[in-house]
Design a protein with these regions (language model features):
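Secreted/periplasmic carbohydrate-active enzymes, especially glycoside hydrolases
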Residues: 1-300
């Protein structure tokens, strides 16, 4: 596979779980290291038209599927993907390999330098006061997507005397018509059509602190009577405003009490650990917090 230690193979399946280097007994290692696993390409997935794995890794990564390089990435705080539709072997096993690197430089985040010792070993010299976490921190998902699909959407909210209005914009990669519906449980409360429009919600239940009501948003692409793609998400209707030095939620002042929250913990470093995430939120609620700040990167 090349230079650098080969870490333990990670779990093969629909969700490929990769373990970060700082939990493998190599806390001072600096340089290249490999992850490798196999996964099964389900029969029929190739007909959907787009197949891509999604992962998140520090600090640099080169990704290979069946020996073919499919992606390079630098920066560890946002996910990235690669199209592997024509590389995956369907109805058989495939090999996924990731060459990761945790060397620091002054042009990356977090910043630092990498020094080379007299014996040739490299060491990290960070410009920060926390451990230089590295490796793949989240599960890797293999996604099969239709050829024409919803790429993104955005919403803006307005409160009215009778409820609320939601202005939306949907981005797709094809020409077919789009419909948007909003559900409260099993009840459809608003609908519209087109890639831009407005959902009018009567007697809207607003998202609020300790009462975070959520609606189900359903976006569909239609080709005749067939649904080409369907995208579901949960949204809360609320407005934020800062006026005269006060933070207003839905037009009412709110005193913010909370924490700056990091992702790392004693159990798995920065590797995803859902019980720890649950514990953190329960502790914040127990102590009376009503907010937290992502410190200092987007949390996944």
């Amino acid at each position: 596979m090349g230079a650098g230690p080969a870490l333990l193979s990670f779990h093969a399946g629909a969700c490929l779980l990769l373990r970060p280097v700082h939990r493998q007994g190599l806390p001072r290692y600096c340089g290249d290291f490999w992850y490798e696993t196999s996964f099964f390409g389900p029969c029929g997935m190739e007909r959907l038209g787009h197949c891509s794995p999604v992962w998140l890794g520090h600090h640099r990564a080169r990704v290979f599927v069946n020996g073919v390089e499919v992606a390079q990435h630098e920066g560890g705080f946002l996910p990235f993907d690669a199209t592997v539709t024509n590389i995956v072997r369907y109805n058989q096993f495939n090999k996924l390999s990731v060459l990761a690197n945790n060397e620091l430089s002054e042009t990356m985040l977090p910043a630092g330098t990498t020094r080379t010792l007299a014996d040739g070993r490299k060491i990290a010299a960070p410009y920060f006061d926390f451990y230089n976490y590295a490796g793949i921190h989240w599960p890797v998902w293999l996604m099969a997507l239709p050829k024409e699909r919803v790429l993104d959407y955005s919403t803006r909210y307005r409160l009215t005397e009778t409820g609320a209005e939601i202005d939306y914009t949907v981005s797709t990669n094809g020409p077919h018509p789009v419909t948007v519906e909003l559900y409260d449980g099993a009840t459809r409360v608003a609908e519209s059509s087109g890639t831009t429009g407005t959902l009018v919600v009567k007697n809207a239940k607003l998202w609020n602190i300790h009462a975070a009501h959520l609606y189900d948003l359903v976006i569909r692409i239609h080709e005749g009577s067939a649904v080409v793609d369907e995208y579901l998400d949960r949204i809360g209707i609320r407005t934020f405003e800062i006026r005269h030095g006060r933070f207003l939620l839905n037009g009412s002042p709110v005193y913010l009490r909370g924490f700056g929250r990091h992702e790392d913990a004693d159990i798995r470093g920065r590797g995803l650990d859902l019980p720890t995430v649950k514990r953190d939120f329960e502790l914040m609620k127990w102590i009376g917090a009503n907010c937290f700040r992502t410190s200092h990167y987007p949390l996944r």
